[in-house]
Amino acid sequence: AMDVQKPDVVLALGKRSLLTVNAAKRPAPLVLGAVRDVDYQYPGILMIPDPEVILERLLLLAPDVKRVHVVQKGEGEDIQLRGAKEYLASRGVELDIRHSNDLREAASIYADMLEKANASDAVWILQDGSYVNSAIFSLLLDAAWNKNLVVFSSNPLHVKHGALFAVYPDNKKMGASLGEIANQVLQKRAEP
């Protein structure tokens, strides 16, 4: 269809759309939206919530929190945490990031974390789940009730299962922003 219609710019929503567009050897510039991976070299919008938005909400709802625990999959930088440590430090809150390479290691980390936690602690579940399966989620929620901990998530699905809150995208604003990016791509292409 792209060969026949020859669009000026292509908007791909999600990884599957990107793969389809790339397989079609698109002749037009690409704007990418609704992906969770930063490895793509296209202009667009990621579906990863800004950590400052999440942490600001946490501190509004639970102002007594002094330490936030998070389990990160693997080593290295995680875009979901970019700027989080500095943001929390500026508000007198510590960010405790622990790294896990598999579910078993994560379960051990969560158990250790919860054993030492108190009412001034919060547990942040990252969007990818941070190896949180139903058993670990139940463990987190039990500790939340027993120790008066805050459990919050970057994944909206966790709220219906008991997380205090999560954030979700404003799809209309995201669509408008993607349209603006597409227009910017077209304008730059038209400039000498």
Q: Predicted regions span which residues?
A:
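Short hydrophobic alpha-helices and adjacent helix-cap/hinge residues
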Residues: 1-192
